[in-house]
Design a protein with these regions (language model features):
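Short, glycine/charged-enriched secondary-structure capping and boundary segments
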Residues: 108, 115-117, 145-149
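Hydrophobic residues on the short alpha-helix immediately C-terminal to a glycine-rich phosphate/catalytic loop
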Residues: 105, 117-121, 142
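Conserved G/P- and acidic residue-centered "switch" motifs that form tight phosphate/ATP-binding loops
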Residues: 83, 107, 132
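Walker A/P-loop NTP-binding motif
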Residues: 88-96, 111-126
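Short hydrophobic/aromatic beta-strand immediately N-terminal to the Walker A/P-loop
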Residues: 100-103, 131
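SF2 helicase/translocase NTPase motor core
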Residues: 122-169
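Phosphate-binding Walker
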Residues: 105, 112-115, 137
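Charged, low-complexity
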Residues: 1-100, 148, 153
Length: 169
């Protein structure tokens, strides 16, 4: 039966055990939501009920541009539209408890997008602390960009040998 083969392939892709299948309860991590939705959306043979939280995750991730996450006022006019979308994507990932990698061509503003995220986190929680880990060749650039674009963030560079870093910390 092709429906069973299709379902078996999906369950294999999610590494669902026979024990879970036998129990009738399959718990799937949130990060698999898109995989499940994509695997099942075109299937006429498999009936799946999606609860409201599942639908919310899918809707949120698929409609990042339309999210309610507002760019901090101090940076709103600085960011280009694609950078605002990048900021909203990072906020969406964080809202659902996901991680992500912001990657694109070099020189189109990832640092500024992350500074915008950090600025927003600071506005939401004054006591928030963040750690940026970057190649030593970019440390001064990060500090310069923070000073240039943020009035609320402060930065401290911790670099040097292991012993020097221990003293700085």
């Amino acid at each position: 039966d092709s429906a069973l083969q299709e379902l078996s392939a999906i369950l294999d892709g999610m590494h669902v055990s026979e024990k879970e299948i036998s129990s009738g309860v399959i718990k799937v991590p949130k990060y698999r939501s898109l995989y499940i939705d994509n695997s099942l959306k075109d299937s006429d043979m498999i009936k799946v009920d999606r609860d409201s939280s599942f639908k919310d995750i899918i809707r949120g991730i698929r409609n990042v541009k339309d999210s309610d996450f507002a760019v901090p006022p101090a940076l709103k006019s600085t960011l280009r539209n694609y950078q605002k979308t990048g900021f909203r994507w990072m906020k969406t990932m964080a809202a659902y408890g996901f991680s992500g990698i912001l990657a694109d061509d070099m020189g189109i503003g990832k640092t500024l997008q992350v500074i915008t995220l950090l600025e927003d986190e600071r506005l939401q929680c004054k006591d928030s602390l963040s750690l940026v880990v970057c190649p030593s060749s970019l440390i001064l650039n990060w500090q310069s960009e923070i000073e240039k674009f943020s009035k609320t963030l402060t930065s401290i560079i911790i670099s040097g040998s292991s012993d020097e870093r221990k003293v700085q910390i």
